[in-house]
Amino acid sequence: RLLSRLRSKSNKLFIAYINQMTQYDSEAINFVLRNVRDNDVKFIRLWFSDIVGNLKGVAITAEELESAMTRGMGVDGSSIDGFARSKENDMFIVPDPTTFAILPWRPKTNAVARMFCEILTPDNQSFEGDSRALLRRNLAKASDLGFTYYVAPELEYFYLKDSKTAEPLDTGGYFDQDPQDIATDL
C-alpha cells in the first residue's frame, strides 16, 4: 500500500531519487539476480541498523528481490526504536546491490544471502536515522572542511585452552610479558 501511494504520487521522483542516491545501475542489479539464480539462493535478508546500531532486517524470497531493488520494500518504522512515531510509521528500505553476499555459514542448497539497505521516508528522502546515509553526509562535510577519512581493520583474537570452553590460555593483557603471557611463543 505504501509503495503504491508513493509511486502513484511521483513515480519519476522516486526513480530519480533512487538513481541519484544509490547510483545503482542495471548491471549491478543483474549481477545480483544472476548470482541468486546460479547459487540456488532462496532467501535474501535485507539488513539495516536502528538508530543505536542494532542490526535489524526482513527476509524476502528470491522472487521478490528484483522488485525490492527497483521499488523498495515497505516497513513499519514505528516498530523500530527511534525510527518513527506511530502516526509517521510508513518507511521503506531499498537493498544496495553492491553489498550482496551469500552467507557462508548457511547450507549451499537453498542458500541465504544478505544485502544492506538504504532507509527512505514516505516523501522519498533519506531517513535522518539511516546510519549509512549519516556516514555519507558526515564524510561529505569532513571532505568540505579539507579532511580525509582513513579506516583500517584491527584484527584481535584470543587463544583458548581448548575448543570446549571459553577459558583463556593465559592471563596476559596488553603489553604483558612472561610469565603471564604464555602465548608469546605460539
Positions of the model-derived regions?
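N-terminal amphipathic/basic-hydrophobic helices that include classical n-h-c signal peptides
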Residues: 1-20
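Glycine-rich, acidic/polar active-site loops that bind/position phosphate-bearing ligands
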Residues: 21-186
